[in-house]
Amino acid sequence: MILSLNLLHKISPKLKKIPLNELCAALMDLGCEVETINSIKPSTNLVFAKVLEKTRHPNANHLNLVKVKANQKVYEIVCGANNFSVHNWVVLAKLNAELANGLKITPRELRGYVSNGMLCAYSEINPQATSFLTSTDLDGILVLDDNYDHYKTPNQIFNLDDVILDLSIPSNRNDLNGYFWIAKELCAYFDFEYVVDATINHRPHKEIIDVRILSDDVNSYGIIEVKNIQNYILKWNTKSILINNQIKVLNNFADNMNFLTLLTANPLHAFDARKISGQIVVKNAEEDAILLGLDQKEYLIKKGDLIIVDDQKILALAGIIGSNDSKIDATSTTAYIECANFNPMLIANTARRLKINTAAAMRFSKPLTNYVTKVTLKKLLANFKSDAKLIYYFKHSVHNVIKNKINQVSDFVGAEIDLDTAQTFLKRLGYKINKSNLITPSHRYDVLNEFDVYEDIMKKISIQEIKPQPISFDILNFENNLAYDFEKKVSDFLVDQGLFECKTYNLKNQTQAHEFNFFNFKQAYEINNPTSNMRSHLKLNNLNSLLEVLEYNQNQKNELENIFEISKINPVDSSQQTVLSIILCKPLINSKINDSLIVNNFVTTKALLHALLTKLNIDYAYDKNHVVNELYDNNQLALINANKQVFGFIGQLKNQVKKTYGLSNDIFIINLNLTSYLNQKQVITKVIKPSMYHDVIRDISVKLASDVDLNNIIANIKKIKNIRKVEISDLYIKDDGIIYTFKYYINDHLSNLSSEQIIIIEQEVNNYLKQF
């Protein structure tokens, strides 16, 4: 969000006395991060001047000879602009003036006449604003009427003395896009009174046009009639505020509405009253239709989208974009202005589908309260005064009432909090407080429970001011954090094998939280007041999340990779569990001959598992008696420890499970509960004295059946005298079998082996493998 200090001070003059550094610190405490601070470079030696004479230059048709008067002195100027008349007030850059665009004003002869100054265009005194101006404003000089404040300088009138803050506001505080609400927060912080009144005393003139609401996706809806819209000319003092907020000026009527939205955060939309046939109806589309938008693009409206219609046509895609058929144009004199509040999820989904990024769509995609909408409607009526009539206003009344637990804030924070200070601050924010309950501020939807109230209190009582307390936590008493070291060892090993580590949400919907519950945890924790039903329970597995990662990347047309996650699982019925989940969707081993010959299968998955558990010094055995429904019966095994307890599963995912995620690759999974191994001290591995002699390395390839125990083969080859190490270096498919290449290392450690001794060892290996 862009924050203009000039506008903030105009809304709340009391904030003028707050130094900039204190204001920025307050914004940070309130959750609004100040990313940049920019001061507009003002021009020097500018004055307002009244036009006395204007004649055509005798030697140049495109120039005018102008006499202007400023501070009782007359200046003769040569000017190329034509958008002004005698008696208008203009901006004069006197001699020796230096403009913000770098131009220095000196006497200059133009076709025989000397110009003793320059009449300025807005882009010349604020060159950064070029992209926010209309072509008319770019081509002409600044012209004011007699009503401007004669006691202010041009830099003050055009807000060129402004300081602009670029803020990052909390994602759940859409209201803070409006100056009224950010001013209210700041005033509460500095203990100033600030009230935004939403009382509307206008009676509805329902006889003007009939309005009907036929959708539950409308939270509130107001519409007013405004006549003589051509008379509402936005003064440069206000127009320059829009520009400082990086809002493009369009026309006087649109600029008026954009300024109101800037104040309240609630977008507005207007229809030309002449172009409305019959009644106005807000409803969900009953069938697909085409809308020609204000941007002259066609959009496909789908059944269920929220639309606004009259008796003949679609007037707007609610909260997103208006129709070209009902737009305000240069000939419009009467408008119906809509001030509404819609279902943000529906607006966000529709805008995303249609790839529409209008300012209205972005604002309406996040919640605002009906109070904000009502304040906006009140300001609309006040802005257009006697030309405005309220036609219709509807709202759902919602007051969020929560239990008063302010007296428990000290226990929650872990430090003594002054309750009087806390209550005063909350009341300034708009809370209504009694002994038993709190009514949350009318303009806020983000306060759902007492913890949100505590968060508000801590905005005033900065966490930085609380004295630090020593932390008492058992894990800090460990000489070494064995659990961390263990998990790091697992992660490093898998990354070395080419797998990618993932970190996914712990929160899922109720169904997803209980899927792939291989370890029979009884119940998942449910979250109180979740932000969404999709984030309502703590997950009991990682596999659902990892499969969603694959699904997302496949939809984005990214190459799928082998992935894993180590996460903390918190079941209701037991202590915290550490679960490792691995998903293999592509080959682990790359062939040196031909990539197409390599497959991802159960054998390679078992080999990875064996290598991992060997690295971790974990003894295990396979068990066929424990099965899970998500894996093929003939392609899954449980892992049991020395106490015959199941601590993991390995297997191939069934096709029907894969299809729910839109996946077609063969997918093999490893799911291990590593909780009991986290804090075990690692076994010290004894090593023999390094050999003084080089290894003799030999390779042998052999065709093996898919059900052969490779670990057993490797162990038996290692039993042959003088073979110190055996590994699988390659494998590939040939005909109906798999050919494995075993690499073995021969070394006597004490002396060089003769050729005859090496041949004998080779024969022993060959003879052993012949049985397969």
Swiss-Prot record:
- Under what name is this protein listed? Phenylalanine--tRNA ligase beta subunit
Question: What does the cofactor section's free text say about binding?
Answer: Binds 2 magnesium ions per tetramer.
> Which PANTHER family does the record cross-reference, listed alphabetically?
PHENYLALANINE--TRNA LIGASE BETA SUBUNIT (PTHR10947:SF0), PHENYLALANYL-TRNA SYNTHETASE BETA CHAIN AND LEUCINE-RICH REPEAT-CONTAINING PROTEIN 47 (PTHR10947)
Q: Where in the cell is it found?
A: Cytoplasm
Would you identify the family this protein belongs to, as annotated?
Belongs to the phenylalanyl-tRNA synthetase beta subunit family. Type 1 subfamily.
Q: Which SUPFAM superfamilies match?
A: Class II aaRS and biotin synthetases, Nucleic acid-binding proteins, PheT/TilS domain, Putative DNA-binding domain
Q: Which organism is it from?
A: Ureaplasma parvum serovar 3 (strain ATCC 700970)
Q: Name one GO cellular component term.
A: phenylalanine-tRNA ligase complex
Q: What is its main location?
A: cytoplasm
Quaternary state and interactors: Tetramer of two alpha and two beta subunits.
